Every structure is written in structure tokens, then in C-alpha cells.
């Protein structure tokens, strides 16, 4: 990754001139004023860069009211913007601050924080809005994408925001990342509730596969593609469900076993709808085979 992208755009003579101006203003006791003017200009550049990447300034309420399909598109744009910001834009701004305020580390740190704070808060607020939004099972996979993006960017948060002024931003990123983990666990709880609430209505003709069995098992199979991330999420909150032994199992496998146990209980209740005991047995056999 080219961390010098911004410095490369600016001629060396311009950076040297900015350094001379900063040095004179700090020496004259106008360090804060210099930092403020510099930060305002660079902040505008960052905001424009995020806008060009497609990131919109959305309130939490706007995110929550957005149709899911539109929010999926916003999440894709957010992932791109977050990666470019943390891996390219912010490190470049850090290097530029260090060049302009060379010899004045406190002014450099303060200026960098002021430059990046607004854009960082914009990125984190969107992730937070996703985390505290609806926990409908269909949202799992995109929320996993946001969780994984923040997780993978944690080393960048640690290195780029390492000074005293930026510790709040770093801690906020960790807090929101953990909140996304809570949201993912909440989605699995909602899946459990969905199974419990699925009513025993008309019997499936011929004792065939019930839609709830197909939905839940296809959902779990799709979720298992992100099993490493899900294991990390559930290991953060080890609370074995009642009736399931976890002595030699991961927290994720315990969760999966519990959901399948709920599904089997739900299907057993549905099998009692059949007046013909043979059809009831066929129903359990067909659905049991699909679950296995």
C-alpha cells in the first residue's frame, strides 16, 4: 500500500514551505491557530475523498429507516471507504502532519486528530447504526461483513491512532466492533425465536420436507461459510444454552446444536398434526434426514 499517496501529490517545496510557516507560528505562540487552519483544510480534503468513494453522511435514524436492499449497497460502499481510509488516507495524513509539524510532535498529533476525527466518526457511526439496528436473520451476512472489516482494520486503528489525542477514536472502534459481535449473537437468538414462533398449521402433503426445516438448515449451512468469524463472535460470550453440554465443544457448535435441537422439537410438534401415524413417521424421517 502506498502510504505516501498524499505527500507524492504535494510538491516537496510546498511541504517545506508549510513546515516553515508552522515553525514560525509555533515559535510565535500561535501553534493552536496554525493547527486549526491546517486541520480545517485537510479535513475538507478527507471529507471530499470519502464522498468520492460513495460514502454518504447518514444519521442513525436514516440508516434504520433505509430499505434493506439499499442498506446492503451502503454497506458495500462503507467497506470500501473504511479500507481506503485506514490503509491509505489516514496513514498518508499522518505522514504529512509529521512533515509539516516536524519537531513539534504535540502539534502534529493534535493536527492529525483534528484532520481525521470527523471522517473516522462518520465511518464508526455508520457501523454503530448497523450494529444497533434490526436483528432480522436475513441481515446476518452483511453484518458479518462489517464485523470482519472492523476486525481486520484493528491493527491500522492501533498504529495510525496511537497518540494520546486519538485514544478515544481507537477505543470507540473497539467498542463498536464488540457491539457488532453482540448484534450477531442477537441475530441467532432471533433465529431461535423464529423457530419457536413457527406455528403447527396444515400438515405437509405426503409427509414431505417442511419449509422451516429447509430454511433453517440452508441458513446454517450458509452461516458456516463464516465459521471462523462466528467462532470468534461466540467465544466472546460463552453462555451454553440449557440442555446442551459444552464440555468439549466450541461455543459456535453449542449454538448450532441448540438451534437444531429447537428445530427438531418444533418438527416433532408438527408431526402430531398427522392423523396417520405412518405419515407422521415419514414426515420425521424426511425432515430428520435433511437436518443430518
Range-by-range predicted roles:
Residues 2-7, 36, 51-54, 61-64, ...:
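Long acidic/polar interaction regions in large eukaryotic complex-forming proteins
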Residues 63-292:
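Extended alpha-helical solenoid scaffold regions that build the rod-like backbones
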Residues 6-57, 70, 138, 211, ...:
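Extended amphipathic alpha-helical scaffold segments
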Amino acid at each position: 500500500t502506498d502510504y505516501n499517496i498524499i505527500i507524492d501529490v504535494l510538491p516537496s517545496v510546498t511541504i517545506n514551505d508549510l513546515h516553515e510557516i508552522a515553525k514560525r507560528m509555533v515559535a510565535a505562540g500561535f501553534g493552536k491557530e496554525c493547527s486549526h487552519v491546517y486541520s480545517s483544510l485537510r479535513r475538507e480534503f478527507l471529507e471530499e475523498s470519502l464522498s468520492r468513494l460513495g460514502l454518504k453522511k447518514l444519521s442513525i435514524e436514516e440508516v434504520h429507516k433505509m430499505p434493506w436492499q439499499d442498506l446492503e449497497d451502503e454497506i458495500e460502499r462503507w467497506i470500501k471507504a473504511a479500507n481506503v481510509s485506514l490503509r491509505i488516507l489516514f496513514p498518508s495524513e499522518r505522514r504529512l502532519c509529521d512533515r509539516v509539524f516536524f519537531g513539534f510532535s504535540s502539534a502534529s498529533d493534535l493536527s492529525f486528530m483534528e484532520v481525521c476525527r470527523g471522517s473516522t466518526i462518520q465511518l464508526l457511526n455508520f457501523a454503530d447504526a448497523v450494529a444497533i439496528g434490526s436483528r432480522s436473520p436475513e441481515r446476518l451476512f452483511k453484518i458479518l461483513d462489517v464485523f470482519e472489516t472492523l476486525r481486520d482494520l484493528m491493527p491500522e486503528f492501533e498504529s495510525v491512532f496511537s497518540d494520546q489525542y486519538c485514544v478515544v477514536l481507537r477505543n470507540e472502534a473497539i467498542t463498536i466492533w464488540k457491539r457488532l459481535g453482540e448484534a450477531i449473537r442477537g441475530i441467532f437468538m432471533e433465529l431461535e425465536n423464529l423457530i419457536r414462533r413457527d406455528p403447527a398449521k396444515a400438515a405437509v402433503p405426503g409427509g414431505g420436507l417442511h419449509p422451516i426445516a429447509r430454511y433453517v438448515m440452508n441458513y446454517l449451512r450458509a452461516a458456516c461459510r463464516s465459521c471462523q468469524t462466528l467462532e470468534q463472535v461466540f467465544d466472546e460470550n460463552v453462555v451454553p444454552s440449557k440442555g446442551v453440554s459444552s464440555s468439549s465443544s466450541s461455543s459456535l457448535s453449542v449454538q448450532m446444536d441448540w438451534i437444531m435441537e429447537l428445530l427438531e422439537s418444533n418438527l416433532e410438534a408438527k408431526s402430531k398434526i398427522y392423523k396417520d401415524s405412518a405419515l407422521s413417521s415419514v414426515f420425521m424421517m424426511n425432515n430428520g434426514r435433511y437436518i443430518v
